[in-house]
From Swiss-Prot:
Organism of origin: Magnetococcus marinus (strain ATCC BAA-1437 / JCM 17883 / MC-1)
Any one biological process term the GO annotation gives: protoporphyrinogen IX biosynthetic process
N6-(pyridoxal phosphate)lysine PTM positions: 272
Keywords: Cytoplasm, Isomerase, Porphyrin biosynthesis, Pyridoxal phosphate
Pathway: Porphyrin-containing compound metabolism; protoporphyrin-IX biosynthesis; 5-aminolevulinate from L-glutamyl-tRNA(Glu): step 2/2
Family: Belongs to the class-III pyridoxal-phosphate-dependent aminotransferase family. HemL subfamily.
Name of protein: Glutamate-1-semialdehyde 2,1-aminomutase
E.C. no: 5.4.3.8
Record-linked PROSITE patterns: AA_TRANSFER_CLASS_3
Higher taxonomy: Bacteria, Pseudomonadati, Pseudomonadota, Alphaproteobacteria, Magnetococcales
Amino acid sequence: MDQRGGTMSRSASLFQQAAGLIPGGVNSPVRAFKSVGGIPPFIREAAGAMMTDEDGKSYIDYVGSWGPMILGHAPKEVVAAIQQAAVRGCSFGAPTSNEILLAQKLIELVPSLEMVRLVNSGTEATMSALRLARAATGRDAILKFDGCYHGHADSLLVAAGSGLATFGVPSSPGVTRGTAKDTLTVPFNDLAAVEACFAQHPEGIAAVIVEPVAGNMGCVLPRPGYLKGLRDICTKYGTILIFDEVMTGFRVDLRCAQGFYDVTPDLTCLGKVIGGGLPVGAYGGKMELMNQVSPAGPVYQAGTLSGNPLATAAGLATLEAISQPGFYETLTSRTQRLTVGIGKALDEAGIPHVSYHIGSMFGLFFTDAREVYNFADAAKNDHNRFKDWFHCMLEEGVYFAPSPYEAGFVSIAHDEAIIDLTIEKARKVAKTL
């Protein structure tokens, strides 16, 4: 039986089959619908703003593969770039000209980048950036924020958001005490707590790593002055400031969140959008830091598929498309139209909530609170109401993230007609909650 009370025969069968072959039946935990219950639709194909499952049901997609699909699914220019690259070879394990072109484009667009290294995932990017920060400072401790998720490297699975928040665990078995000891955590949006943490660790902190917009606890915005305050504190203590822009990179703005908020970190981590839907990641920053990375320097990092020709081709095509005049104005306007419309629908139904949006990211919290500024606030989300909302919208053919701790995403393929249809469905569902 599925979440709609009927049968989802093909997806149900596939999920059952997958469970005997893949842990939990999925290759990333949140996809299993543990937080909301029911059987996840197995997706057969997608185009534009729409996805179709193995049972033939179509959905307006606001997950966007968890962020990368800023152009929508299967955009012609990206598909063509991948096809043209594939006939020349899928992987060489040797340098290619497209790696240079993608690096040049990233350095051109992202304020903090003077040099960049391509990797295969956001986790690889954050893991490598932290290793570099520790090597450059000679310090061990890192500071992160409750509810911020930076990938599944051991040192970053302490008080993490996203999947760990979804499953209600503060860390993961297998993370050693020694690793956890070197990972310090404080609440997001609390500069006093950051200062206090530095005061308590006179031996010094190697790096502060932060999502400039906390998308892994449901799109929580930084308070005015918060990011600049982090910049000032890190400069004061000789600590490396790392912006994890794997999610916010090119979602908030063409210059990423750092350009939007006019705060320049020492290192930046990227992923998702820069691969156009293919596996990719990157980390970069000041030349003096990046020249410490092997083979230019002693800090080792490598990858068989790093700089993959298909991923770089897809990334270049995507970055070219989003660099066109008016792209972000249109995308931001549509995201605002969606969140304002859903908010009005919930208001009309008398359902307490808080919503946020920035660029093409958005978050919705079912709460009596007037604002959500940290993980403790986000955790007050009414999970039962969220489950009802999720399943009712899914029944209406609208696919939101199956967890209250995940941001939503709008693509340029979500035109006003699709946005308005979503709002109409939200108004219908809100009356039933």
